[in-house]
Amino acid sequence: MRFLVDANVSPRVAALLAAADHDAVAVRDVGLAAAPDDDILDWALTGDRVIVSHDTDFGTLLAARRQVKPSFILVRSSDPLTADDVAGLLLANLDSVAEDLGAGAIVTFARGRLRVRRLPLG
């Protein structure tokens, strides 16, 4: 799977996903560290990448645009998560949501729960 890891998620998550044989890059590594969310969304769409973020704004943008892609993984936690925690959470659950992400979805990951909403929203 192809991932774009947002600036508010440790770039180490991209490295850990890449080490697990996924094509993963961090926004800072592709010149998007200070880019607005719209630009990040467009870049992910062009590259058929799943955005990984703690930022709920991507869901709002996808709903406003009524887009089917790119898929978006929202990582939520009331406790701070390390890069290893985030990557572990994703890798442990990717098989169960791969079809949804491939079709276009917002997937919310949190410890102990998972929510999938197919795109477009609305």
Describe each PLM feature range.
Residues R2-P11:
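N-terminal beta1-alpha1 ligand-phosphate binding loop
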Residues S10-R12, A24-G47, A64-R66, D79-L81, ...:
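Basic nucleic-acid-binding interfaces
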Residues L16-A24:
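Short helix-loop-beta junction
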Residues L45-L62:
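Acidic, metal-binding active-site segment of PIN/NYN-like and related structure-specific nucleases
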Residues G59-N93:
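Mid-chain, well-packed structural core segment of small domains
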Residues D95-G122:
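Charged phosphate-binding loop/patch that engages nucleotide di/tri-phosphates or the phosphate backbone
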